[in-house]
C-alpha cells in the first residue's frame, strides 16, 4: 500500500511539473504576440508582420525582440532625423562646411532699442508739459495734490500728523492741553469744579445729601437702619443688649420686677395660674408627683386601711391585677429594646470581627441589635474605636422565637443536604 502511494505521489509531481513548463512556454509566446500587435512603423499605417516568427524558435524570438526594441527607440518625427541621416553619408570636408554654415545660422540675434533722433520728438509725449517745470521734481510725488494747497505751509510740519484731523478744529485751542484727556468728557461740566476733588468719589452719590452732615460719622453704620427710629432714644443704652430679645415684649412690663428672677423658669408654665394661690405653700413639694392621677378617685377608698403591697386589706380585684401584670412582664421581655449593658456586652463579644458591614443580630428571638463601623472610621485600630462616635447601631427584630421550630427547621435542612449527597 505504501509503495502505491509513493508511486502515485511521484507520478503526480512529474505530471504537474511538465504541465507547468508547457504553460510557461505558451504564456511567453502569447505575451510576445500581444506586444508585437501593438507596434507600428513610422508611417503609423502598417503593422509589423512578425507573428509567424514566434514559432521558429528562440533565435527568431530574440531577433523579433531586438527589432521591436529598435522600432520603439526610433523617433516618430521623420523631419527631425532626415537632416542627421543625410549628413551621415557626407565626407569630412562637407561636414565641416555644413557646420560653419550652421554656426552662421545659429548666431544669436540682438534686438536694438529704438532711439529717437534729436529732431524727432516722441509722438506719445504729453503735449501739455510745462516747459518751465522743475527738473528735480520727485518722480514719486502724489499726482492728486490739492491745487489750492497753502503755498505758505509749514516746512517743518509733523510728518506723522493725523490725516483724518478735524478741519473745523478750534484755532485758539490750548496748546498745552492734556493729550490723554477723556474724549467722552462732559461738555457741560462745571468750569468752577474743585480741582482737589476726590477722584474716587462715588459716582452714584446722593445729589441731595445733607451739606451739613457729620464728617466723623461711622463709616460702618448699618445701611438698613430704621429710618423711623426714635429720635429721643437713650444715648446711654446698653451696647451689649441681647440681639435676640423679644420684639413683642410687653411695653407695660412691671418696672419693679425681680432682677434676680429664675432664668430657667418653665417656658410652658400655665399662663392661667391661680393669682390667689397660697403664698405659704410647701416649697418642698414632691417634684415627681404622678401627673396622671385619677381625678375621679373614690374618696371613700382612703379609709380602707394604710397597708401597702400584700399587707393591704382584702381587695377582690387585687389578685386578678397582679396575675395580669406578671403575664404582661413575661410577654414584653421579648419585645423590649436592648439595654446599654446588652449593647456593651455584644460589642465586646464581636470586637475582633467588627467591620463596615452590619453584624448579625445579637439575639435569635425578640429585639436585638446590629452594629458596624462607620465608613469614616474604617481605618482606625479596633482597640481605639469609640463606641459612641465610631460605631453605628440599629435595632433588629427576630420573629421566629420558638426553639422547637428552629431545631426542626435545622434538622430538615440537614436531612435534605445529606440525602442529596448520598443519593446522587
From Swiss-Prot:
This is Circumsporozoite protein. Pfam families: TSP_1 (PF00090). Residues 1-18 form the signal peptide. Residues 104-111 are annotated as: Required for the binding to heparan sulfate proteoglycans (HSPGs) on the surface of host hepatocytes. Sequence repeats lie at residues 123-126, 127-130, 131-134, 135-138, 139-142, 143-146, 147-150, 151-154, 155-158, 159-162, 163-166, 167-170, 171-174, 175-178, 179-182, 183-186, 187-190, 191-194, 195-198, 199-202, 203-206, 207-210, 211-214, 215-218, 219-222, 223-226, 227-230, 231-234, 235-238, 239-242, 243-246, 247-250, 251-254, 255-258, 259-262, 263-266, 267-270, 271-274, 275-278, 279-282, 283-286, 287-290, 291-294, 295-298. It comes from Plasmodium falciparum (isolate t4 / Thailand). A lipid is attached at residue 401 (GPI-anchor amidated cysteine). Glycans are attached at residue 364. Essential sporozoite protein. In the mosquito vector, required for sporozoite development in the oocyst, migration through the vector hemolymph and entry into the vector salivary glands. In the vertebrate host, required for sporozoite migration through the host dermis and infection of host hepatocytes. Binds to highly sulfated heparan sulfate proteoglycans (HSPGs) on the surface of host hepatocytes. During host cell invasion, proteolytically cleaved at the cell membrane in the region I by a papain-like cysteine protease of parasite origin. Cleavage is triggered by the sporozoite contact with highly sulfated heparan sulfate proteoglycans (HSPGs) present on the host hepatocyte cell surface. Cleavage exposes the TSP type-1 (TSR) domain and is required for productive invasion of host hepatocytes but not for adhesion to the host cell membrane. Cleavage is dispensable for sporozoite development in the oocyst, motility and for traversal of host and vector cells. Residues 301-316 have a biased composition (Polar residues). Transmembrane segments: none annotated. The gene is CSP. Residues 349-402 form the TSP type-1 domain. GO terms for cellular component: cell surface; cytoplasm; plasma membrane; side of membrane. Residues 120-300, 322-336 have a biased composition (Low complexity). Keywords: Cell membrane, Cytoplasm, Disulfide bond, Glycoprotein, GPI-anchor, Lipoprotein, Malaria, Membrane, Repeat, Signal, Sporozoite. Residues 85-106 have a biased composition (Basic and acidic residues). Disulfide bonds join 361-396, 365-401. SUPFAM superfamilies: TSP-1 type 1 repeat. Residues 402-424 form a propeptide. Residues 69-339 are annotated as: Disordered. Residues 112-116 are annotated as: Region I. Coiled coil: none annotated. PANTHER family: SPORE COAT PROTEIN SP85. Residues 123-298 are annotated as: 44 X 4 AA tandem repeats of P-N-[AV]-[ND].
Amino acid at each position: 500500500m505504501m509503495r502505491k502511494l509513493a508511486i502515485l505521489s511521484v507520478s503526480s509531481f512529474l505530471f504537474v511539473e511538465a504541465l507547468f513548463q508547457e504553460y510557461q512556454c505558451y504564456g511567453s509566446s502569447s505575451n510576445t504576440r500581444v506586444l508585437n500587435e501593438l507596434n507600428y512603423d513610422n508611417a503609423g499605417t502598417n503593422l509589423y508582420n512578425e507573428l509567424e516568427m514566434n514559432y521558429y524558435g528562440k533565435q527568431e524570438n530574440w531577433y523579433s525582440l531586438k527589432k521591436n526594441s529598435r522600432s520603439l527607440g526610433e523617433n516618430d518625427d521623420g523631419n527631425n532625423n532626415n537632416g542627421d541621416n543625410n549628413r551621415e553619408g557626407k565626407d569630412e570636408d562637407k561636414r565641416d562646411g555644413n557646420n560653419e554654415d550652421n554656426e552662421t545660422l545659429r548666431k544669436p540675434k540682438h534686438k536694438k532699442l529704438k532711439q529717437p533722433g534729436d529732431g524727432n520728438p516722441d509722438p506719445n509725449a504729453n503735449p501739455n508739459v510745462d516747459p518751465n517745470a522743475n527738473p528735480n521734481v520727485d518722480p514719486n510725488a502724489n499726482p492728486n495734490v490739492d491745487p489750492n494747497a497753502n503755498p505758505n505751509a509749514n516746512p517743518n510740519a509733523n510728518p506723522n500728523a493725523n490725516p483724518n484731523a478735524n478741519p473745523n478744529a478750534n484755532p485758539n485751542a490750548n496748546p498745552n492741553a492734556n493729550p490723554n484727556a477723556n474724549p467722552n468728557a462732559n461738555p457741560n461740566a462745571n468750569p468752577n469744579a474743585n480741582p482737589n476733588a476726590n477722584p474716587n468719589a462715588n459716582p452714584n452719590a446722593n445729589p441731595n445729601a445733607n451739606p451739613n452732615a457729620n464728617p466723623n460719622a461711622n463709616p460702618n453704620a448699618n445701611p438698613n437702619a430704621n429710618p423711623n427710629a426714635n429720635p429721643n432714644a437713650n444715648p446711654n443704652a446698653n451696647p451689649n443688649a441681647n440681639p435676640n430679645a423679644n420684639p413683642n415684649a410687653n411695653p407695660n412690663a412691671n418696672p419693679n420686677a425681680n432682677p434676680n428672677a429664675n432664668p430657667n423658669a418653665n417656658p410652658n408654665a400655665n399662663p392661667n395660674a391661680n393669682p390667689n394661690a397660697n403664698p405659704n405653700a410647701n416649697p418642698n413639694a414632691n417634684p415627681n408627683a404622678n401627673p396622671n392621677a385619677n381625678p375621679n378617685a373614690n374618696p371613700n377608698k382612703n379609709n380602707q386601711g394604710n397597708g401597702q403591697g400584700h399587707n393591704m386589706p382584702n381587695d377582690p380585684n387585687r389578685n386578678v391585677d397582679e396575675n395580669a401584670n406578671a403575664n404582661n412582664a413575661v410577654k414584653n421581655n421579648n419585645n423590649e429594646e436592648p439595654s446599654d449593658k446588652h449593647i456593651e456586652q455584644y460589642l465586646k463579644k464581636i470586637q475582633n470581627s467588627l467591620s463596615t458591614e452590619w453584624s448579625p443580630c445579637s439575639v435569635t428571638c425578640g429585639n436585638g441589635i446590629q452594629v458596624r463601623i462607620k465608613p469614616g472610621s474604617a481605618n482606625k485600630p479596633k482597640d481605639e474605636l469609640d463606641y459612641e462616635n465610631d460605631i453605628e447601631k440599629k435595632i433588629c427584630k427576630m420573629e421566629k422565637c420558638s426553639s422547637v421550630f428552629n431545631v426542626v427547621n435545622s434538622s430538615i435542612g440537614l436531612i435534605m443536604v445529606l440525602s442529596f449527597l448520598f443519593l446522587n
